[in-house]
């Protein structure tokens, strides 16, 4: 049995099918960089990150956020094997980029906030609980190489 029930998978997939990856990805990554400014050190090549407005309107932040959420979408297609789905990204972030694995958990929590903002009442407590499990599972899978 996987970490999500069939009902939870249905809730996650149902909401995710409505997500605008371009918009939500850029907003989630932008919020991560604003709320947790120490994460900006991994994105110094992105140009102006001097203020919340600069970050949220930064084209490179938006593009990378889209890339992150496209990877997240691919992972959802392999929800019962997140470790396998994210193995290469775990290796990249650990061995080459040296990203603190705690940042994966932070980004997951920011993503949940952004989804709640975008979907309002549709993002009810059951949907949130399912997504919290998913983002925790993705963070764990991305951190796997670190252990």
Swiss-Prot record:
Gene3D superfamilies: Globins. The keyword Protein biosynthesis does not apply. This is Hemoglobin subunit beta-2. The modification N6-succinyllysine is found at residues 18, 60. Belongs to the globin family. SUPFAM superfamilies: Globin-like. In the cat family (felidae), the oxygen affinity of hemoglobin depends little or not at all on the association with diphosphoglycerate (DPG). It comes from the Eukaryota. The lineage of its organism: Eukaryota, Metazoa, Chordata, Craniata, Vertebrata. The keyword Glycoprotein does not apply. Involved in oxygen transport from the lung to the various peripheral tissues.
């Amino acid at each position: 049995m996987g970490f999500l029930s069939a009902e939870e998978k249905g809730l996650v997939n149902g909401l995710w099918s409505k997500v605008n990856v371009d918009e939500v990805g850029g907003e989630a990554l932008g919020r991560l960089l604003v709320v947790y400014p120490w994460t900006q050190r991994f994105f110094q090549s992105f140009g102006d990150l001097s203020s919340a407005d600069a970050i949220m309107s930064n084209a490179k932040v938006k593009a990378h956020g889209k890339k992150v959420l496209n990877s997240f979408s691919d992972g959802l297609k392999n929800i019962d094997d997140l470790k396998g789905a994210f193995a290469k990204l775990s290796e990249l972030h650990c061995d080459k980029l040296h990203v603190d694995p705690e940042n994966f958990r932070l980004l997951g929590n920011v993503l949940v906030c952004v989804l709640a903002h975008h979907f309002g009442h549709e993002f009810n407590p059951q949907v949130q609980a399912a997504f919290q499990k998913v983002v925790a599972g993705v963070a764990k899978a991305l951190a796997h190489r670190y252990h």
